[in-house]
Amino acid sequence: MAYAQWVIIIIHNVGSQDVKIKNLKASWGKLHADGDKDAEVSASNYEGKIVKPDEKLQINACGRSDAAEGTTGTFDLVDPADGDKQVRHFYWDCPWGSKTNTWTVSGSNTKWMIEYSGQNLDSGALGTITVDTLKKGN
């Protein structure tokens, strides 16, 4: 039932410097393994993961089956070369029984460029969102 509410977030490091994921939390729904909504995974599997240059990291979340809930969550991208200074904060909300989804990117770190695409803000799944990260300069 609520498996129709899902999001896949692909972090793609298109730059030449590492970026790290921190503080991933699904406050509604669950995180799951690639391609298997029944295989729940812990946020700790992602905590502190480094996305190296030209690598991708995929985060999958969905509502719970047979439950009237969608998926909501947050995470941060941080700069491991700058004391884990926040690059951006990300928030998603793909609620069950609502006609509106939310994808918000907040914060500012002028050393980094962040571009994203693919989010569906209408009803149904939030979809597959690609987040490109690039640290400016060396």
From Swiss-Prot:
GO terms for biological process: symbiont-mediated hemolysis of host erythrocyte. Monomer. This is Ostreolysin A6. Keywords: Cytolysis, Hemolysis. Belongs to the aegerolysin family. InterPro entries: Aegerolysin-typ (IPR009413). It comes from the Eukaryota. Pfam families: Aegerolysin (PF06355). Has hemolytic activity against bovine erythrocytes at nanomolar concentrations in vitro. Promotes active pleurotolysin B (PlyB)-dependent permeabilization of membranes rich in cholesterol and sphingomyelin. May play an important role in the initial phase of fungal fruiting.
